[in-house]
Amino acid sequence: MEPSVLQINKKLETKKEVGLPKISIDEAKVSLTGIDGDFNRFRSTKKNNDSKMALLVLTSDIINELNDEGWPIKPGDLGENLTLTDIDYRSLAPNQKYAIGSTKIEISFICDPCSNLKALPYVGKEKVNDFIKTLLNRRGWYAKVLKAGRIGKGDIVKKI
């Protein structure tokens, strides 16, 4: 099977809420700053909308691993914008470029887990430290948008 987009996720800015879990959408307009309408407080306030952090990408194999370890994660829970399938998470690396829909992205760097994950109902304050340790090197990859366009659920992910 060819790698493809399993799910596209975004969350509108909501006062006093963190940017996760994100909600599934069928299609997204993607600009150089990320998915239109998606809000990431950390990226916008602490990182000055760093273009290398425009998208957060996660693969379904990591979600499956975490489910097998007892964490009931669903696509979008970790704040990722794109959940990809049929691609090995550990094969992703900085500077790799991909065409997805009419967009082009470049993998930037790994996303470190943070304490905002306590907002997930199955984590909470009690388990957040264990969850952060569990997610080290598995939270997802940030990506820069090289070419704006549209991405739809089911779009093929091609390495370029």
Q: Predicted regions: what is each one?
A:
Residues L82, Y98, A143-V145, V157-K158:
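Short beta-strand element of the conserved SAM-dependent methyltransferase core
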Residues M1-I100, K104, F109, N116:
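Electropositive, beta-rich accessory/interaction domains or terminal extensions
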Residues W71-N81, G124-R139:
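Short, basic/aromatic beta-hairpin or loop at an interaction surface
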Residues A99, E106, G152, K158-K159:
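Hydrophobic beta-strand signal
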Residues T83-D86, S91, R139-G149:
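Short alpha-helix capping/helix-loop boundary micro-motifs
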Residues N95, S102, A148, G152-G154:
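Loop/turn positions that initiate beta-strands
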